[in-house]
């Protein structure tokens, strides 16, 4: 069973629908015991970094997520969920993140002819491979975001060009992030969720 973490940050119905398409048994939950008992976790999200972290704190889920990862639980952050994986974010001041991947979430700089938010389809460029990134070079996926994850190169798997290399996928150990929306990215996005499913159940078999 996978748990989609519930913290009122939107797009959960689309994520659950996409997981069902790749035959993943999943449900939405904010229950700490269910999160800690899950085979894998998905942290979706749209909205503002500080508001999301405040809601995770209010629900007592920050330490729960950190404990689940420390226990070896695979975690996939999507869009805002990926940004929250970092140490901090600079939206409306500086806020602490989950601290699972080193880095800072920064606003995409204003550039001529490139509106912010970065919205729509963009092509992926491979930087290094991970369990989720096979056959992604040149594939097109759907983005909607105004902030990007500034992470050390060792955690950067895939980028998209938007005047600067925008981190599209990152990972550290069993923690993965997609800045784009796999649930809105057609067959390519479903393929990434399928790979996460395979990774989760390979991980489960080791315990």
UniProtKB/Swiss-Prot annotation:
Keywords: Amino-acid biosynthesis, Cytoplasm, Glutamine amidotransferase, Histidine biosynthesis, Hydrolase, Lyase. Its EC number is 4.3.2.10, 3.5.1.2. This is Imidazole glycerol phosphate synthase subunit HisH. Residues 1-206 form the Glutamine amidotransferase type-1 domain. Pathway: Amino-acid biosynthesis; L-histidine biosynthesis; L-histidine from 5-phospho-alpha-D-ribose 1-diphosphate: step 5/9. The active site is at residues 79, 181, 183. It holds the Pfam family GATase. Its main location: cytoplasm. Gene3D superfamilies: 3.40.50.880. It is found in: Cytoplasm. It catalyses: 5-[(5-phospho-1-deoxy-D-ribulos-1-ylimino)methylamino]-1-(5-phospho-beta-D-ribosyl)imidazole-4-carboxamide + L-glutamine = D-erythro-1-(imidazol-4-yl)glycerol 3-phosphate + 5-amino-1-(5-phospho-beta-D-ribosyl)imidazole-4-carboxamide + L-glutamate + H(+); L-glutamine + H2O = L-glutamate + NH4(+). One of its GO terms (molecular function) is lyase activity. GO terms for cellular component: cytoplasm. It comes from the Bacteria. One of its GO terms (biological process) is L-histidine biosynthetic process. Heterodimer of HisH and HisF. HAMAP family: HisH. IGPS catalyzes the conversion of PRFAR and glutamine to IGP, AICAR and glutamate. The HisH subunit catalyzes the hydrolysis of glutamine to glutamate and ammonia as part of the synthesis of IGP and AICAR. The resulting ammonia molecule is channeled to the active site of HisF. It comes from Streptococcus sanguinis (strain SK36).
């Amino acid at each position: 069973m996978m748990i989609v973490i519930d913290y009122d940050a939107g797009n959960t119905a689309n994520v659950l629908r996409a997981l069902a398409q790749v035959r993943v048994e999943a449900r939405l939950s904010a229950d700490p015991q269910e999160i800690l008992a899950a085979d894998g976790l998905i942290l979706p999200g749209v909205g503002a970094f500080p508001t999301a972290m405040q809601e995770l704190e209010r629900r007592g889920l920050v330490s729960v997520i950190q404990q689940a990862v420390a226990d070896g639980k695979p975690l996939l952050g999507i869009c805002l969920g990926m940004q929250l994986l970092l140490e901090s974010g600079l939206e409306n001041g500086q806020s602490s993140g989950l601290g699972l991947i080193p880095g800072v979430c920064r606003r995409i700089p204003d550039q001529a002819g490139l509106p912010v938010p970065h919205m729509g389809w963009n092509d992926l460029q491979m930087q290094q491979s991970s369990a989720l990134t096979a056959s992604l070079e040149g594939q097109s996926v759907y983005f909607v975001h105004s902030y990007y994850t500034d992470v050390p190169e060792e955690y950067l798997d895939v980028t998209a060009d938007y005047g600067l290399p925008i981190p599209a996928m990152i990972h550290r150990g069993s923690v993965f992030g997609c800045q784009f929306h796999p649930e809105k990215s057609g067959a390519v996005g479903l393929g990434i969720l399928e790979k996460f499913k395979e990774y989760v159940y390979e991980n489960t078999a080791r315990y």
